[in-house]
Amino acid sequence: MAREKIRIKKIDNITARQVTFSKRRRGIFKKADELSVLCDADVALIIFSATGKLFEFSSSRMRDILGRYSLHASNINKLMDPPSTHLRLENCNLSRLSKEVEDKTKQLRKLRGEDLDGLNLEELQRLEKLLESGLSRVSEKKGECVMSQIFSLEKRGSELVDENKRLRDKLETLERAKLTTLKEALETESVTTNVSSYDSGTPLEDDSDTSLKLGLPSWE
């Protein structure tokens, strides 16, 4: 047989009400203590009786638990508060930037030749002019780059010509110095050779007029 569901309502009899309050209070405190031990939870209960008497239970220091509750409630209230003027302005700027990014992305896709099906003749002509203008700027920039490279190459070529001339002049100077040294060496060697030949091959001159003549004297 099913148990009849007890209807919960205020107990009119004051004595019965106080007895029930005492029993239920002890029961709920016991359940809170079990919850704290079994689940390693911080539990705090505050009960005021009908006469205004305070009853409390806490698994740790009541002040610490209430402090955590106050901090948590404060954070929730901040989240529930309407956004500040600064935050609304930031959201507005974010929406504007997102719209600009979306528009630029669409424009870029069209410049690539994509998503052109929905464009009318006027929009296509405007896109064509935009492409022509962009192509003109690209060509102009390309010309500037080419001229810059030509200038750099010409400058490098001039530097190489100057360097080549400097090396050639240096080489000619070295060759002239080498020839001068060789010529001086040959001249010195020639003088030495002539002196040696003179000392060994030239006979001494005889200053004496004495001579031996045989035969009859000639009569003129």
UniProtKB/Swiss-Prot annotation:
<keyword id="KW-0221">Differentiation</keyword>
<feature type="domain" description="MADS-box">
    <location>
        <begin position="1"/>
        <end position="61"/>
    </location>
</feature>
<keyword id="KW-0963">Cytoplasm</keyword>
<dbReference type="GO" id="GO:0000977">
    <property type="term" value="F:RNA polymerase II transcription regulatory region sequence-specific DNA binding"/>
</dbReference>
<dbReference type="GO" id="GO:0010220">
    <property type="term" value="P:positive regulation of vernalization response"/>
</dbReference>
<keyword id="KW-0010">Activator</keyword>
<dbReference type="Pfam" id="PF01486">
    <property type="entry name" value="K-box"/>
</dbReference>
<dbReference type="GO" id="GO:0046982">
    <property type="term" value="F:protein heterodimerization activity"/>
</dbReference>
<feature type="region of interest" description="Disordered">
    <location>
        <begin position="190"/>
        <end position="220"/>
    </location>
</feature>
<dbReference type="GO" id="GO:0009739">
    <property type="term" value="P:response to gibberellin"/>
</dbReference>
<dbReference type="GO" id="GO:0048438">
    <property type="term" value="P:floral whorl development"/>
</dbReference>
<dbReference type="GO" id="GO:0005737">
    <property type="term" value="C:cytoplasm"/>
</dbReference>
<dbReference type="InterPro" id="IPR002487">
    <property type="entry name" value="TF_Kbox"/>
</dbReference>
<dbReference type="InterPro" id="IPR002100">
    <property type="entry name" value="TF_MADSbox"/>
</dbReference>
<keyword id="KW-0539">Nucleus</keyword>
<dbReference type="GO" id="GO:0045893">
    <property type="term" value="P:positive regulation of DNA-templated transcription"/>
</dbReference>
<comment type="function">
    <text>Transcription activator that mediates floral transition in response to vernalization. Promotes inflorescence fate in apical meristems. Acts in a dosage-dependent manner. Probably involved in the transduction of RLK-mediated signaling (e.g. IMK3 pathway). Together with AP1 and SVP, controls the identity of the floral meristem and regulates expression of class B, C and E genes. When associated with SOC1, mediates effect of gibberellins on flowering under short-day conditions, and regulates the expression of LEAFY (LFY), which links floral induction and floral development.</text>
</comment>
<keyword id="KW-0597">Phosphoprotein</keyword>
<dbReference type="Pfam" id="PF00319">
    <property type="entry name" value="SRF-TF"/>
</dbReference>
<dbReference type="InterPro" id="IPR036879">
    <property type="entry name" value="TF_MADSbox_sf"/>
</dbReference>
<dbReference type="GO" id="GO:0030154">
    <property type="term" value="P:cell differentiation"/>
</dbReference>
<keyword id="KW-0804">Transcription</keyword>
<dbReference type="GO" id="GO:0048510">
    <property type="term" value="P:regulation of timing of transition from vegetative to reproductive phase"/>
</dbReference>
<dbReference type="GO" id="GO:0042803">
    <property type="term" value="F:protein homodimerization activity"/>
</dbReference>
<dbReference type="GO" id="GO:0010077">
    <property type="term" value="P:maintenance of inflorescence meristem identity"/>
</dbReference>
<keyword id="KW-0238">DNA-binding</keyword>
<feature type="compositionally biased region" description="Polar residues">
    <location>
        <begin position="190"/>
        <end position="200"/>
    </location>
</feature>
<protein>
    <recommendedName>
        <fullName>MADS-box protein AGL24</fullName>
    </recommendedName>
</protein>
<keyword id="KW-0805">Transcription regulation</keyword>
<dbReference type="InterPro" id="IPR050142">
    <property type="entry name" value="MADS-box/MEF2_TF"/>
</dbReference>
<comment type="subunit">
    <text>Interacts with IMK3/MRLK. Forms a homodimer and heterodimer with SOC1, AP1 and SVP through MADS-box domain. Interacts with the SEU-LUG corepressor complex when complexed to AP1. Interacts with AGL15 and AGL16.</text>
</comment>
<dbReference type="GO" id="GO:0043565">
    <property type="term" value="F:sequence-specific DNA binding"/>
</dbReference>
<dbReference type="InterPro" id="IPR033896">
    <property type="entry name" value="MEF2-like_N"/>
</dbReference>
<keyword id="KW-0217">Developmental protein</keyword>
<dbReference type="GO" id="GO:0005634">
    <property type="term" value="C:nucleus"/>
</dbReference>
<feature type="domain" description="K-box">
    <location>
        <begin position="87"/>
        <end position="177"/>
    </location>
</feature>
<dbReference type="GO" id="GO:0003700">
    <property type="term" value="F:DNA-binding transcription factor activity"/>
</dbReference>
<dbReference type="GO" id="GO:0045944">
    <property type="term" value="P:positive regulation of transcription by RNA polymerase II"/>
</dbReference>
<keyword id="KW-0287">Flowering</keyword>
